[in-house]
Amino acid sequence: MAYHGRGDGYDGHQLQDLPGGHNQGDQHDDAQAPFLSENPMPYDNDRLGTDTPPVRPVSAYSLTESYAPGAGTTRAGVAVNPTPPPHGGYGGGGVSSGVDQGYNYGGDYATDPAYRMSAIDEDDSWLRRQQPNAAPTGGLKRYATRKVKLVQGSVLSLDYPVPSAIRNAVQPKYRDEEGNNEEFFKMRYTAATCDPNDFTLKNGYDLRPRMYNRHTELLIAITYYNEDKVLLSRTLHSVMTNIRDIVNLKKSSFWNRGGPAWQKIVVCLVFDGLDKTDKNVLDVLATIGVYQDGVIKKDVDGKETVAHIFEYTSQLSVTPNQALIRPVDDGPQTLPPVQFIFCLKQKNTKKINSHRWLFNAFGRILNPEVCILLDAGTKPSPRSLLALWEGFYNDKDLGGACGEIHAMLGKGGKKLLNPLVAVQNFEYKISNILDKPLESAFGYVSVLPGAFSAYRFRAIMGRPLEQYFHGDHTLSKLLGKKGIEGMNIFKKNMFLAEDRILCFELVAKAGQKWHLSYIKAAKGETDVPEGAPEFISQRRRWLNGSFAASLYSLMHFGRMYKSGHNIVRMFFFHVQLIYNIANVIFTWFSLASYWLTTTVIMDLVGTPVTASSSSAEHHGWPFGDTVTPFFNAVLKYIYLAFVILQFILALGNRPKGSKWTYITSFFVFSLIQSYILVLSGYLVARAFSVPLDQQLQLDNAKDAMASLFGGSGSAGVILVALVTIYGLYFLASFMYLDPWHMFHSFPYYMLLMSTYINILMIYAFNNWHDVSWGTKGSDKAEALPSANVSKGEKDEAVVEEIEKPQEDIDQQFEATVRRALAPYKEDETPEPKDLEDSYKSFRTMLVVSWLFSNCLLAVVITSDNFNTFGIGQTASARTAWFFKFLLFATGALSVIRFIGFCWFLGRTGIMCCFARR
């Protein structure tokens, strides 16, 4: 039966709107007591100062909750505004749309002893609250107990009443007061003591959406590691508003058929370990009803719990600025019910294992059509999740898709003042404008970022997921040599970019013709590293993982022939193969290419040349014939010295331990690059100082090409470089209707682009051995209560469970909400040192081969001592040819990207006219 609360007339907490403003001290009666409390608290009267306006950010909405029964009258179960206290009471009227500013939810967190202790010893406080007989006011309390039968004698699955405030927040039209549906009145907890592969109906495990016979069309997964409550709230609230966009569709031929749209959507949160979880985040989840303290069990009858699974359907949400939102009316801004599954893993077993819980455990029971993957901190824009789903709905062969990820720039773009943020913003933008559309045109997007991507569930079932989960450390014993422990260092690095492996396996799936696509209308916003150490550490994993995964896809390209793709698609896959091989080669030799480009430009501009029959006279620029060559030589030595320094730092230091040295390196390379840009501008001006018609021989096409690109002609080479490298960036950005990054981020990128090779790639390759795998146990889990099994009256397995009265549940909820809505204070505790000392021999061989091949290329190009090997050209001639080849090859790759972008843009514009709605 549905839960109806107590039978003595206790109605619990009533959610109600209170006008926004500040506290008036004691100028209110008992019926209008602050927040949830009947009794005076030390932080009530003086938490903000009498008649002092709050300092918390003010939302456009208002929601508070009164513990005093009858505080405000109710109508059909929905609380309405009480009469304001005298003199304006709580302040000026807030808009009654369902959000609370948050400042009425607690005290002065900087001075309150209770909250100061909580901030210092947060984890210990959380552990004390997990004891079943913990009283809301502290200490222990004796409670009545109930005996609960285990499912199939081994599975612990219990229903717990939610706080009255959460129950009363549900709109009446969704309540099933007389039926058996308890999803709004009780939270369901399951202690999973099995591997994700064994989380099956056969073994006694189940999930509410399937129990209610609901079809799951969309499974939205949020993976979490150690993000703070602001980052999680940003993602979670954006997801709920996106679900509201879907529910509000009026003319949908799908979502409005066969039941309410919200019943076809499930949000799954997977947290990677108790130790790493920010306990303030759990308070946020408890505030919306998805989690409760004092519920989890570390083991069931001695069998260790692997994952704690909570289920609840909520209409509440917490915004990133700690404002609580609840439904007020049936307007379009009201959040619909959202079905939540919260999986809190007991141990930190990495992201791949979190995805195994998602796909192999929950996915097989719910059998969704589309799974959307988000990282905590990613903020999907309005209607973005709908746009991702529509891509699958309109293309039956679409196996995976991703949207546009862009950097979070702060209010007014203030973060763009940080060069690292601006560089990453430009990188994201160009990837979204040129790279992703090109790969989408081919049908194989090399990486669908795990922070914002989607897959068709039946497309990834089978071999794609099997190969993907080979990187899960918890399967190492089961898989043997195929598992992570049996892999060489190359394969381990490959799984640092595991999403690339899944993409390739999906497209190459035998007998199938799944393809991948980029969906422009879906946009997500994410934080990017703002400091040099964080930036370098992130790119170490990205560069090593993507390089290994790229080689994997090239070496296993033959498996494409076993797929079901048609001949046209296969032709474009071969074109993409050649394009990817070229990119890998250019990436490998990029260290030498940047050095040669730098020295060639310095020599072309700074070396004085006397007039002769083959060349015109020019002087060293910008400091004259004597100073310029000397200045350039000094810069070359500085350049080489800092490159060598990067090897020393990468082999012996962590970025966080050499922060200022790395910052200095970024600064020095940017100064050298700025000097090269000035010299390049001078080269362009000098090349076009003679009118173009005088440089060209237009007698015939052959002579015209020879005068433009051959011999001593430099105008043609420079013209090609300007158009293909820089011109296409501007043209594509304007065609994409998003050109602003070319003005505020492109200049930073021009200054720092050499650091991508000279700092980031050097650090990445020198730390090839650093793969952070393995399972880390949970120290906190040892202090959690156990579920002891005994025999019941009919000899069945039962567990004795504490049964708290509703008053205690509600009183505990008071403190939870205060903690959840407290102002966020950033944790500045330094991270512990984490070093991996294995596989250094492989790293050494990799670095030696990479460094030797790049040095060999540089020496061959710039040295005159190779005549004995049959190389008759002088070093200056070889340098000129290499420089031309480099510019032409780079230009050709840019043209290919631009063609792919044009095809994608045209196809997207045409197909949107025929897409089903």
UniProtKB/Swiss-Prot annotation:
InterPro entries in UniProt: Chitin_synth (IPR004835), Chitin_synth_fun (IPR004834), Chitin_synth_N (IPR013616), Nucleotide-diphossugar_trans (IPR029044)
Catalytic activity: [(1->4)-N-acetyl-beta-D-glucosaminyl](n) + UDP-N-acetyl-alpha-D-glucosamine = [(1->4)-N-acetyl-beta-D-glucosaminyl](n+1) + UDP + H(+)
Keyword Disulfide bond: no
Function field: Polymerizes chitin, a structural polymer of the cell wall and septum, by transferring the sugar moiety of UDP-GlcNAc to the non-reducing end of the growing chitin polymer.
Membrane topology qualifier: Multi-pass membrane protein
Transmembrane region(s): 571-591, 630-650, 665-685, 717-737, 745-765, 844-864, 885-905
Glycosylation sites: 544
Species whose genome carries this gene: Neurospora crassa (strain ATCC 24698 / 74-OR23-1A / CBS 708.71 / DSM 1257 / FGSC 987)
One Gene Ontology term of the molecular function aspect: chitin synthase activity
Predominant cellular place of this UniProt entry's protein: membrane
UniProt-recorded name of the protein: Chitin synthase 1
